C-alpha cells in the first residue's frame, strides 16, 4: 500500500464506549498489573516463529502434547511483526499476514464432541504496543471516513498502567484476542471474526485465572493463541486495543463424557459465562442466553423456565466484540455467589 505519513499530535480525542445491551455487572476491574500470573513451570515451549494465521484442520500441528500439559507460548502483536515502535502509517500493512497465531497444539486424546479446557496461568506483556484508526474499520468507520492514525507506545515493565496521554493512564489488563481450535473443514478460514471454534473473541474478560472451554471438532483439537492485547474495552469500538507482543502460559486438558457445548464458554472463581456469535447483536444475545439456560438446566438441575428467569434476575449480558465483521460476540456472566455451594 502507498505510505502516507501522518503526524500524531499530543492532543487526543476519547470516544466513550457505547452500551447496546444490559451490561456492567461483571465488567473487567481496572485493578491489574502489567504482568498477571499464576506461576507454573511449563512442560513445552512454543516460539513466535511457530505460527499460522488461518483456522483449518489441514494445518499441521507445531506441537503434540498429552492432556494436562502446561505450555509457554510467545506471540507477535496483531500485525505479525509488520508494525514496529517506529511505524507511522496504519495502512502500510499486508492484511493477509495479520493475526499470526502461535500453534496449533495437538492434544493427545482429544476427539470431536469433547471439550478442550485452556486455563490461563501467566500473561506477560512486551515492551511496546500500538493503537490505530484504520479507514473502513471500527464501529464508527463511516464517521471517521479516510482518517488514519497510528500511535505507538513504550510500555513500562515497572508500571501498572499505559501512559495513553498526559494525565490519562489506562490499567494493564492483558489477554489474547484470538484463541481457538480447528474447525471441521479443509477450508482455510480467516481469523477476523469470532466463530463456534473460538477465533477473534476480543473479550477482555479472558485474563489470568480464567478457564476457557472450546468444543472440539477435529482429532487433537489443534489449539492456537495470538492477537495479544495489553488492554482493551468491551466492544473494541475503534477496532484495536493496545496491540502488543506477549508471552502466555496455559494449561491445556481434554474433558470427556461431559456435556456438549456449541460455542466457547469460560469461568473464573467468581462467575460462569456463555458466549454467542452472530451477524447481529440481538441474535448473539439470544444465543448467549440460550447457552446459559442450557448450563443451568444441565449442570445446576434447574427447569428451563427457572433457568430463564434466573438468567434475567442475576445474569449480565455484555458486548464483547462489535467490530469484527461479519460476526459480533455477546457474553452472559452469572455470578457463582448466588449458589449455596459456591466456592
Cite the ranges covered by each PLM segment.
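Conserved mixed alpha/beta catalytic, RNA-binding, or beta-rich assembly cores of soluble enzyme
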Residues: 174-200, 204-282, 293
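Bacterial lipoprotein signal-peptidase II cleavage site
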Residues: 27-33
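C-terminal motif of bacterial Sec signal peptides marking the signal peptidase cleavage site
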Residues: 23-25
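Bacterial N-terminal signal peptides that target proteins for export
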Residues: 3-15
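Long, compositionally biased
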Residues: 325-343
